[in-house]
Amino acid sequence: MYQTTAALRSAFLEYFRTNGHQVVDSSSLVPANDPTLLFTNAGMNQFKDVFLGADKRSYSRATSSQRCVRAGGKHNDLDNVGYTARHHTFFEMLGNFSFGDYFKEEAIHFAWTFLTEELKLPKERLCVTIYETDDEAFEIWNKKIGVAAENIIRIGDNKGAAYASDNFWQMGDTGPCGPCSEIFYDHGDHIWGGRPGTPEEDGDRFIEIWNIVFMQYNRQADGEMKPLPKPSVDTGMGIERIAAIMQGVHSNYEIDIFQALIKKTAAILGVTDLENKSLRVIADHIRSCAFLIADGVMPSNEGRGYVLRRIIRRAVRHGNKLGATESFFYKLVPTLIEVMGDAAKGLQETQAIVEKSLKAEEEQFARTLERGLGILDAALNELTTKVLDGETAFKLYDTYGFPVDLTADVCREREITVDEAGFEAAMAEQRKRAQAAGQFDTDYNEGLKIDEQSSFTGYTELNNQATVTAIFKSGEAAETITAGDEAVIVLDNTPFYGESGGQSGDKGVLIADGIEFTVIDTQKYGQAIGHIGRVVTGEIKAGQSLTANVDKKLRHRTELNHSVTHLLHAALRQVLGAHVSQKGSLVDPERLRFDFSHFEGVKANELKEVEELVNTQIRRNHELTAEVMDIETAKEKGAMALFGEKYDSEVRVVTMGDFSIELCGGTHVGRTGDIGLFKITSEGGIAAGIRRIEAVTGAAAMAYVAKQQAQLEEAATLLKGDSASVVAKLKAQLDKTKQLEKELSQLKDKLAAATSADLAGEAVEVNGVKVLVKKLEGVDAGALRGLQDELKQKLQSGIVVLAIAGEDKVNLIVGVTKDLTGKVKAGELVASIAVQVGGKGGGRPDMAQAGGSQPENLDGALEQVIPWITAKLS
């Protein structure tokens, strides 16, 4: 019964559906509008605002199977993954929730009935914990459910403070909180461990499978616990743990999902030992990595992207340990989709981008992995203690891309720890250097808090009468402002659009008799719309009536650029694939900028196709419609939501014919034909997996095309042709240039040979070794390498040091014949010179190059060469 994890998931959701719960899809692994969380790590995350009373749903009971990641930040299981039976970076949390509906008795009954009747777990294998003073829960378990008193364990404040307990849950220092009750399963006395609350509780015999949280208090800032008017319930059960019980195994890695991934990995890498811990690591990591990419996270060097990169690189390192000689990680995605069943729907839709992203990241890391491992291995072999210094760990991170936890993982296998304090100190020094080189800007009204509300009228009008409800000057509330004052004015209603959703704020004026206030920007402050600007004439007071006039021309140009981003988004998805999602945008009167997810640069033919597709939709002159509807209806209509955005229960849906439908609160043109023309001006990468397109529309696009045409005609004139023959003429010119460069190179070689014959005679003897140190004039830097080769051949045995000085640049090269590299190494010698001329360099023992930025110090540096060589040869 329920022998697969997929069947168990379906049974859980169906059980609660038949008990009046709304089945809610798993939310993204990237929490919507919650800066406190790196990743979704519990089933209740998507319902947080419901529990806080800030969001209302059409249902009061819900159930879900939530994808979760714990890696990085406070909740970090990465170090233990693969080494224990139950630590994972990715897991699924089965849960049922009550928003002021049922409470303790029903919640306990639902859990017990599902476990003992639906799954038929033996009651004698189960015991429960409750908060020490929760007598109500004890009575329900004992009297209503029939659990013996000795199997109900009271857990008190075991974390050093009041209400700090394994059995008391709280969202934060203040807010909803309450006692919880946990259900434990006894795996049997053949496994070491004791019941909860005993000294042996950390063993693996008794495993928590279900946690039922009773939110019944609202914790105040002073610590007082006030009862909630409508108590709620939040529960969670890890699917991997209950699957292990149902499948008769002890370790989560023995369940069907992990076994399929372990066997597939072993088959790809030719591994026969299926108990190898590296196989466990890889099987776990493919789940978190694949689903994170499917949810829009791309490998990068910051934030969520860096956590993803760390997990991928850890998996790749374990693959390398198992003998992987080529990319393998991405090949596990089809197996993952197969074993995850219904939970893999989103992954299936993004399979291509997931596989390509994993493969690209693996190939990138493979270039430095072997060298980094070699350096780490050498450092570990030289250790006289059991601690690797932080400087070495930092070098591996900074130069070879080794996350510190990957270094720690390698060290752990040799029972060595990493000096993480030393690593952090080295990181801090790097940050200081970066900050010293950077500049930081401050927002004009950073931290401004406004309680007032404004109604936006700008969808249908660009001017209206309004009343001043608040004034802020220098960040403080003010009653009056006069000519010359800079301020933020809040109106009760306004046609001015406050910057949001990538659309810049409107400009314009606020006027009345004898009064003019120039609006240079409009921003949103909570529910208020703030008009930022300067008083030109008159005096403005709170409560005063003004006429708000938006600059019509600027608004119209902004609308052209905003509307076309919707067409661009749809066109990119059509040309590049459904994995494309918007990652950011900026639309103002001058241009538009659109950031989107894609694993490689957009090819020229693809850009051309996108541009043509957008212009086709412009010519079709679709009418734009904007409707307000509930979010579920919008999703059913296929409206695209922006990744990571949080939406109200009612949303505004903007539709452009049959081509584009998106959730959007911005302002737009009436018909796509109003846009006139769309022209892409640039495309490039801004982060790993994130591309950026910049473009112009309307008159700006026409001006851009006209400028390109003028440049084409100017090029034609220079090439003595017309615009139709430019390509052919340019190709012929390039071929001619290539031939001339080839001839020039041959002449330089001849010159170098001739020069070397003369220079070789200038060599001096140092302890029986011929040494040539020469500052060259009129020699191209590109000829240095060939020249030092010629000189070494002429000398047969000797050392050559050549230098060229420019206005603000120095080029150095050192050559050492191979019979002398045991005593003098070119890399060391060139480095000793380079440091004196403001540079650095290196290379092989027989040839090394360097550069510098202080030509004024070159003569003095060259004077030190002979003494340096003398010391080495003596």
Swiss-Prot record:
> What is the annotated localization of this protein?
Cytoplasm
Quote the catalytic activity from the record: tRNA(Ala) + L-alanine + ATP = L-alanyl-tRNA(Ala) + AMP + diphosphate
Q: Name one GO biological process term.
A: negative regulation of DNA-templated transcription
The record's annotation in SUPFAM superfamilies points to: Class II aaRS and biotin synthetases (SSF55681), Putative anticodon-binding domain of alanyl-tRNA synthetase (AlaRS) (SSF101353), ThrRS/AlaRS common domain (SSF55186), Translation proteins (SSF50447)
- How is the cofactor bound here? Binds 1 zinc ion per subunit.
Please tell me where Zn(2+) binds in this chain: H562, H566, C664, H668
What is one cellular component GO term in this UniProt entry? Answer: cytosol
Alphabetically list the UniProt keywords. Aminoacyl-tRNA synthetase, ATP-binding, Cytoplasm, Ligase, Metal-binding, Nucleotide-binding, Protein biosynthesis, RNA-binding, tRNA-binding, Zinc
Q: Gene3D superfamilies in the record, alphabetically?
A: 2.40.30.130, 3.10.310.40, 3.30.54.20, 6.10.250.550, Bira Bifunctional Protein, Domain 2, Threonyl-trna Synthetase, Chain A, domain 2
| The keyword Nucleotide-binding appears for this protein | yes
Question: Which cysteines link up through disulfide bonds?
Answer: none
- Cofactor(s) needed for function: Zn(2+)
Entry's InterPro entries? aa-tRNA-synth_II/BPL/LPL, Ala-tRNA-lgiase_IIc, Ala-tRNA-ligase_IIc_anticod-bd, Ala-tRNA-synth_IIc_core, Ala-tRNA-synth_IIc_N, Ala-tRNA_ligase, Ala_tRNA_ligase_euk/bac, DHHA1_dom
The record's section on PROSITE patterns has:
AA_TRNA_LIGASE_II_ALA
Q: Does the keyword Transmembrane helix apply?
A: no
State the domain notes. Consists of three domains; the N-terminal catalytic domain, the editing domain and the C-terminal C-Ala domain. The editing domain removes incorrectly charged amino acids, while the C-Ala domain, along with tRNA(Ala), serves as a bridge to cooperatively bring together the editing and aminoacylation centers thus stimulating deacylation of misacylated tRNAs.
The record's listing under HAMAP family reads: Ala_tRNA_synth_B
- Biological function: Catalyzes the attachment of alanine to tRNA(Ala) in a two-step reaction: alanine is first activated by ATP to form Ala-AMP and then transferred to the acceptor end of tRNA(Ala). Also edits incorrectly charged Ser-tRNA(Ala) and Gly-tRNA(Ala) via its editing domain.
- Classification via NCBIfam families: alaS
**What family does the database annotate?**
Belongs to the class-II aminoacyl-tRNA synthetase family.
* Record's protein name: Alanine--tRNA ligase
User: Which organism is this protein's natural source?
Assistant: Shewanella halifaxensis (strain HAW-EB4)
Taxonomic lineage of this organism?
Answer: Bacteria, Pseudomonadati, Pseudomonadota, Gammaproteobacteria, Alteromonadales
Q: Report the gene name.
A: alaS
